[in-house]
Amino acid sequence: MAKAIFGEDFSGTLVRDRYAAYNHIGAHWQACLAHIITTLKGIQREHALLPEPEKDNHVDSFTCRLKDLCSRACDIGQKLKSSEISQKSATRMERHFLKHLNNSCKQPLRFKPAETLRRYLIGPDQKNLFTFLRIPGVPPTNNYGEQSPERVNKNETLFVRN
């Protein structure tokens, strides 16, 4: 479906979540950092419901550090958009973000949802987490797309049905 919309020769940069329909569209893409933050919040809520003996002591610090990292990256995206920082400065920041990300993801986690996210963040798609720092005009989230009239209508319809 996505290829039918974007075409076989799409050469732009998609800002997307991990929805499989977007795989193999375009050479570059930006992972939506807002979706990652939402996933981290969900992991925190779910983990908090576990009985104390089943909790992984590292999950809370993992989720807090990564929420902070993603929020700071989004702030940099805003500063890029408003020209408060240059693209050249932003490009240099990617190493800093990756270093902090990799340090935060060193410890394997027992809580499966957190471990699944940790593996994703250190896996081959890691290069797509901070694409916005390398490619001018690419935002760190797809929040704009989430607020399009079609998406708002779909969200309202789903909300009414529940």
Sequence positions of predicted segments:
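Catalytic center-proximal scaffold of phosphoryl-transfer enzymes
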Residues: 1-162
